[in-house]
Swiss-Prot record:
Residues binding Zn(2+) 2: C166, C169, C188, C191
Role according to the record: Participates actively in the response to hyperosmotic and heat shock by preventing the aggregation of stress-denatured proteins and by disaggregating proteins, also in an autonomous, DnaK-independent fashion. Unfolded proteins bind initially to DnaJ; upon interaction with the DnaJ-bound protein, DnaK hydrolyzes its bound ATP, resulting in the formation of a stable complex. GrpE releases ADP from DnaK; ATP binding to DnaK triggers the release of the substrate protein, thus completing the reaction cycle.
Subunit description: Homodimer.
CXXCXGXG motif repeat placement: 149-156, 166-173, 188-195, 202-209
Identification of the protein by name: Chaperone protein DnaJ
HAMAP family: DnaJ (MF_01152)
InterPro entries the record matches: DnaJ (IPR012724), DnaJ_C (IPR002939), DnaJ_domain (IPR001623), DnaJ_domain_CS (IPR018253), HSP40/DnaJ_pept-bd (IPR008971), HSP_DnaJ_Cys-rich_dom (IPR001305), HSP_DnaJ_Cys-rich_dom_sf (IPR036410), J_dom_sf (IPR036869)
Entry keyword set: Chaperone, Cytoplasm, DNA replication, Metal-binding, Repeat, Stress response, Zinc, Zinc-finger
UniProt xrefs under PANTHER family: CHAPERONE PROTEIN DNAJ, DNAJ HOMOLOG 1, MITOCHONDRIAL-RELATED
């Protein structure tokens, strides 16, 4: 079964902060921890899945590799380092950590103040020809996104005015709510955590601080990419709000079908039609490769479906390593539209085979097997 996206496992956006990741992980860990679900295999699997996702995303280097290459970037078999164990997280550790936050402990772990929010990450599907994917290329794309409003410089306020302090939270961005015996701190519902209110909004962005725009970008595609590979353009996602950083743009590669070649990782496959005569007598023919035509020697008595390997004529992987091979599968074509002379020759040839089955070992074996089958009935 294919692994789920780690961000999806934790239920967070790709631009999630470390605090958001930890909060999401603790929530899942408390729910599915084996100490709370003894003997529940499904809960144990979900706990392992959450643990593996958090192990990768909480590590800056592993997260960067995952964002760039997906699961392959952190696969131990490909040089990555993600594991899938329990990671040593006990239920008491997780449980205590949550209550520390709930009662206001942890030295200010209640989240960012001031309302600054990171912009959303964007996804763009880039269609490439096989030749472009194999050799690499540079393409220009246009991406609809949100950019900072130039009229108000992203503040959302009309030029010449400034936001005023929120009267609900007094500019703190947080309010305290009484829930039974506990006093819980929450984001201010009026200013949404900014601590400011815009009394006279900007006419260009209507107080949002961002406007829609088509952004033109140049994307350098490395040689060897394949369908599903992602190219991360840092800071090219949506602009942040209230001074927050921009998100990232993920360019997802989609390689179009090729009229001749099929790709499987670093190897290429193609079918090569050959004549009945060439299959029987042998010969030499030209076959296409991504580097041009090459000669392929066909030995006599070649059967349809035989594979010929052209070493090094495949694809050099984007993450390094030697190029793959081109696998040519020969397909023997039955001649059609025969003239009178050709039919006479084939009739004569067929008669010559009827008295000698050594020329058709597979057919001879099949008929012998069929005869034994009916004899045994």
């Amino acid at each position: 079964m294919a692994k789920r996206d780690f961000y999806e496992v934790l239920g967070v956006e790709r631009g999630a902060s470390e605090a958001d990741l930890k909060k999401a992980y603790r929530r899942l860990a408390m729910k599915y921890h084996p100490d709370r679900n003894p003997g529940d295999k499904e809960a144990e699997d979900k706990f392992k899945e959450a643990n593996e996702a958090y192990e990768v995303l909480s590590d800056a280097s592993k997260r960067a590799a995952y964002d760039q290459y997906g699961h392959a970037g952190v696969d131990p078999n490909m040089g990555g380092g993600a594991g899938a164990g329990f990671g040593g997280a006990s239920f008491s550790d997780i449980f205590g950590d949550v209550f520390s936050d709930f009662f206001g402990g942890g030295g200010g772990r209640g989240g960012a103040r001031g309302g600054a929010q990171r912009g959303a990450d964007l996804r763009y599907t880039l269609d490439l020809d096989l030749e472009e994917a194999v050799r690499g290329t540079t393409v220009t794309i246009r991406v609809p996104t949100l950019v900072g409003c130039k009229t108000c410089n992203g503040s959302g306020a009309k030029p010449g005015t400034t936001p005023v302090t929120c009267t609900t939270c007094g500019g703190i961005g947080q309010v305290r709510m009484q829930q039974g015996f506990f006093s819980v701190q929450q984001t201010c519902p009026r200013c949404h955590g900014t601590g400011k209110m815009i009394s006279d909004p900007c006419g260009s962005c209507h107080g949002q601080g961002r406007v829609e725009e088509q952004k033109t970008l140049s994307v350098k595609v490395p040689a060897g990419v394949d369908t599903g590979d992602r190219i991360r353009l840092t800071g090219e996602g949506e602009a942040g709000s209230m001074g927050g950083p921009a998100g990232d743009l993920y360019v997802v590669v989609n390689v179009r079908e090729h009229p001749i070649f099929q790709r499987d990782g670093k190897h290429l496959y193609c079918e090569v039609p050959i004549s009945f005569a060439d299959a029987a007598l042998g010969g030499e023919l030209e076959v296409p490769t991504l580097d041009g035509r090459v000669k392929l020697k066909i030995p006599e008595s070649t059967q349809t479906g035989k594979l010929f390997r052209l070493r090094g004529k495949g694809v050099a992987p984007v993450r390094g390593g030697g190029a793959g091979d081109l696998m040519c599968k020969v397909v023997v074509e039955t001649p059609v539209n025969l003239d009178k002379r050709q039919r006479e020759l084939l009739e004569e040839f067929r008669k010559s085979l009827q008295s000698d089955t050594s020329h058709s070992p597979k057919a001879s074996g099949w008929f012998e097997g069929m005869k034994r089958f009916f004899d045994d009935l």
